Amino acid sequence: MADLLFEIGAEEIPAGFVPGALRQLEDDLSKALADARLAHGEVRSVGTPRRLAVWARDVAPKQTDARTEAFGPPVAQAYDAEGKPTPAATGFARSQGVEVSALVRAQTPKGERVAVTKVEKGRRAEQVLPALLERLVGGLRFRKAMRSRFDEATFARPVRWMVALLGGRPLKVRHGEVTSGKVTYGHRFLAPKAIALKGTPDDYLAKLRRAHVLADPVERRAALLAELARAGKEAAGKVRDDPALVEQVLYLVEEPTAVVGEFEKSNLELPPEVVISEMRNHQRYFAVVDGKGRLKNRFVAVSATRVKDPAVARHGYERVLRARLADARFFFEEDRKRRLHERIEDLGRRTFQAKLGSELDRAQRIGAVASALARALGKDALVADLLEASRLAKVDLNTGMVGEFPELQGTMGAHYARLEGLKPEIADAIEDHYKPIGAAEELPRSDLGALVAVADRLHSLVGIIGVGEKATGAADPFGLRRSAIGILRIVIARGYHLSLAAAVEQTLDALSGVKLAAGRAVVAEQVLDFLRGRVRAAWTERFDADLVEAVLAAGSDDVVDARRRLEALADAKARPDFGSLAVAFKRVANIQEKAGGSGAAAVDPALLRDAAEKDLLAALEKVEQEVVARRAARDYPAVLRTVATLEPAVARFFDGVLVMAEDPALRANRLGLMRRVAALFSDLADFRKIQAEAPAQARAG
């Protein structure tokens, strides 16, 4: 057994490319070794902006032999009456590269056939690995790649060296004009000389560590966090928590060195989000806060190298930030010269989407939709504020500050609203209507912000789909999936019992002046189908797919209600008696579907002949009122517990009663009894879609 080590050295790879490339290297090498029939131990990747490396421990010295079996014609066609090979047999043997005498008889599902077994002897690992590694590096995919001037080889950035070692012995691997060897290189400035490697992962990491390169991202992250903690204390505060920035900076440096800098206190008069955005998004600096979380006029930059005089680096970082903050102050002061209400008409000169009109059109429609949603929820008192918040929600798009810092849309509008003395709730709604930005981001804080946020997303979703634009595959230029997920997250989190169909219709009303690419009913169904797809995708990440399908089939117009039904059903499925219950109710639903008809039905007690059907009716009458009451209260766990008490009576009914009796009156009465049972659970879930079976003892009984 020997360790395989493979490193690709390159010019600085963009930080966002590195984590994905490392995952791909690890996954692809594992699969390639398996496909090559080379046994191995741990596969792991490490990397920095200048190198991507992967290793496999304990690689077998040679491939395992491959045994393959090929089947030919039936024996009856392969040999004549005297047992001599026919042309069919000789032709098959020739196609397999063997003598006809090598053919054997083999039983197959299609009868006895001639066959040939071939064994491919495994080659030595050093013979297999060079081509395997060339495919590995050539198969790496990046959002953008560069091509060499001299050949077709591509990579994120120009490849400068490669290392390929098996048990310390070099393998010859080529990528473009670069051929692998056994030397790597340390830090570009602190240890640029070549470093000879022994080929083990431990030797690789240790030698690079001495050369000022922490190749392992886990080790480098720990060093980065330690540097940030040290620098925070030096700055008489602490570095503001920012996991996303830590992850980004992690792949910008090979050995992190923190530098504390300072900016003028007067810049703290700017909204803190402006200062933080300038530091983190434009300069990759970490903000420093005091014990109460308030921004200090200090920052921490992470240098990719160590310098003899830290003051030189500090002054450089401060100079860049000083200029950027001066620009921010200028935009802030200029923006304050006009009130938000004075900017509303400016939205008419800003296009939202060519077929959907201006941002002013958009703002007016958002207000109409938000008001309709509020009335549907019985929140009429919010309508005036909703209209005001909707008018102002997009106004900051025309400010200088948002023009310079697009990531602060909504945030700056909220700041300006507060400075102008507008209602705090309206200011919060202006900021919150962009939330959630991502799948795990925070949600709007109030009904006001939540309803404007939902209305904004509904307008985008219905409008964009309505004019014929759709999300296809990986392409979603208008963020339709994000809009749909945002709607669902807000509605469920706030417990809004909204009809999605009605909400879509209300949005189409607001879009009445827009020319739709299809009929109104067609557009409405396209939007609802898109929303249902997002519901299905989101819920199947957490719940069993069959339960999700069962619940959605019973109704998904009110997603809050559907989610509660799903959670109750998932809890019920975890109980040992669920299999029997699901099987019984599935049978009830199947009978009802075949017989036609739905809903509750009258049952004539006088036509009940068997004890089992009389018992079932008695059991039904005991629970029907309770189920109706529990269902009205949306207490679905209680509904399922109550309905579950019917399972023994339903099982006995099916064991002893013929539902489809020859007597039409008996048959109709028994089908009515089935409809009465189905009426108790059919609006909870379609049990026919649930994958379940009764316990073995129940089936045996």
Swiss-Prot record:
Pfam families: DALR_1, tRNA_synt_2f
One MF annotation (Gene Ontology) recorded for this entry: ATP binding
GO biological process entries: arginyl-tRNA aminoacylation; glycyl-tRNA aminoacylation
Keywords linked to the UniProt accession: Aminoacyl-tRNA synthetase, ATP-binding, Cytoplasm, Ligase, Nucleotide-binding, Protein biosynthesis
EC numbers: 6.1.1.14
Cellular compartments annotated: Cytoplasm
Subunit structure, as described in the record: Tetramer of two alpha and two beta subunits.
The protein's name in its UniProt record: Glycine--tRNA ligase beta subunit
Annotated source species: Anaeromyxobacter dehalogenans (strain 2CP-1 / ATCC BAA-258)
Gene giving rise to this polypeptide: glyS
